[in-house]
A protein has these predicted regions:
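Bacterial N-terminal signal peptides
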Residues: 1-13
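Rossmann-fold dehydrogenase core element
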Residues: 150-168, 190
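Contiguous beta-strand/loop segments that form the cofactor/metal-binding neighborhood of enzyme cores
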Residues: 28-31, 232-309, 336-349, 367
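Hydrophobic residues in well-ordered beta-strands that form the structural core
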Residues: 49, 137, 162-164, 304
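Beta-loop-alpha module in the N-terminal Rossmann-like domain of NAD(P)-dependent dehydrogenases
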Residues: 89-154
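N-terminal Rossmann-like dinucleotide-binding module
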Residues: 20-89
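Predominantly a Rossmann-like dinucleotide-binding segment in NAD(P)-dependent oxidoreductases
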Residues: 169-259, 375
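C-terminal helix-rich "cap/oligomerization" subdomain common to oxidoreductases
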Residues: 18-41, 111-113, 341-380
């Protein structure tokens, strides 16, 4: 995990914008600016943002501009970056800070959302956990398993919620596949195949502030392996009900050395379970943007083609394509979900955003890196 908060590295797109009939006057610097909070807020929590270098921040700032969320503070050390976003989203001076700790002390947010380099997620938790402030970061949870373990320790010690956001968590098609599989309509799951990625972060126009760290092995933890491999690891953990794999084998390719000299741009990860096999294909070399999910059982097959469309085939019956039923709050967006979890109205312990599941994700990614480095199957 990771706000829509869209995870992956797609071109920033502002989603679910609302055009009101009239714009009421701003009543407070940090309040949403053009929709009545009583009818439009996705969350009543006082949210804060740590970092602006992740392009997915456009989604939460779009929600702020449209009056759907309350942002009380934004911490970003880069003044040029702060100024750019301030101008684009008409952000008041009163919510902008150059330091996370100063912002927390001044604004006392309920939750901090991380839009900084993955390797810096740990800094947010170090600052927030002792103060009892919950955190949600963009996927993956951390750059390394060691960082994730430290973050887990802090979250458990100080009783905060530490969540990871993935774009695919809010896909109706994926939830439909999960629901059908959970009813044993496909029989025993035997194979899970996940494709994630696009033509490459630079190729699709991600900002330089984003790609500077996304293509750095220290700041991102890897290249395409971390960026898109985490999706498959997360979905497999969810579909396998939190079961840890028994072994991981991976290979990495470097097709675009001139464009991405420091990191791999393609990875294939094979995840072994006692009764099933998972195949993760993560790449910055697809001919188009892709996020899909295939599940094969003893008695049936389902393929979530994209966010909405699902193909189902049971035994030898003809395949049927349908549009998945739209999700409803809090399962349709990360902000509403976040509020219910942090206020203990939704457990959030065994789902795709949970700390428990994302520690397993980090174990899979760590094993994949070791497999690549050592050229062998890694037994967990």
């Amino acid at each position: 995990m990771c706000l829509i908060i869209v995870s992956g590295t797609s071109i920033p797109i502002l989603l679910a914008q609302v055009t009101p009939a009239a714009k009421p006057a701003v009543t407070a610097p940090a309040a949403p600016v053009n929709v009545t909070p009583a009818t439009a807020l996705l969350s009543t929590q006082k949210l804060a943002i740590a970092g602006l270098s992740h392009d997915h921040v456009h989604n939460i700032l779009g929600d702020y501009r449209d009056g759907k969320v309350i942002i009380v503070g934004i911490a970003e050390a880069d003044k040029q970056l702060r100024d750019r976003y301030q101008k684009q989203y008409n952000l008041p001076d009163s919510i902008l800070f150059d330091d996370l700790k100063k912002m927390i002390a001044a604004k006392k947010p309920e939750v901090v959302l991380g839009y900084n380099p993955v390797a810096k997620h740990i800094d947010i938790v170090e600052a927030c956990a002792p103060l009892g402030i919950s955190v949600m970061v963009e996927k993956p949870l951390a750059a390394t398993l060691a960082q994730a373990s430290r973050m887990e320790f802090l979250a458990l010690k100080y009783y905060i919620k530490l969540l990871t956001n993935y774009e695919t968590t809010w896909y109706p098609s994926y939830q439909h596949v999960y629901d059908v599989a959970a009813k044993d309509s496909l029989g025993q799951i035997r194979k899970i195949v996940v494709h994630d990625g696009h033509q490459g972060p630079k190729e699709i126009g991600c900002s330089k502030d984003f790609t500077n760290w996304l293509t750095d092995p220290e700041l991102n933890g890897a290249g395409a392996l971390n960026d898109f491999g985490c999706y498959g690891a997360n979905l497999m953990t969810w579909l396998m009900n939190g079961q840890k794999p028994i072994a991981v084998t991976a290979i990495a390719r470097h097709f675009k050395r001139q464009t991405y000299p420091k990191v791999e741009d393609d990875a294939s990860i094979f995840v072994e379970y006692p009764t099933a096999t998972g195949i993760i294909e993560a790449s910055w070399n697809w001919p188009f943007s892709i996020k899909d999910l295939e599940v094969f059982g003893d008695e049936g097959y389902m393929h979530a083609l994209d966010k909405d469309n699902v193909v189902t085939r049971i035994n030898n019956n003809p395949a049927v394509t349908r549009i998945a039923t739209p999700l409803t709050a809090p399962n349709d967006n990360p902000v509403s979900y976040l509020q219910l979890v942090t206020r203990n109205r939704l457990k959030g312990i065994t789902d795709r955003s949970s700390l428990k599941y994302n520690m397993i994700v980090m174990q899979i990614l760590d094993a994949a890196k070791r497999s690549i480095a050592e050229g062998k199957r890694i037994v967990l």
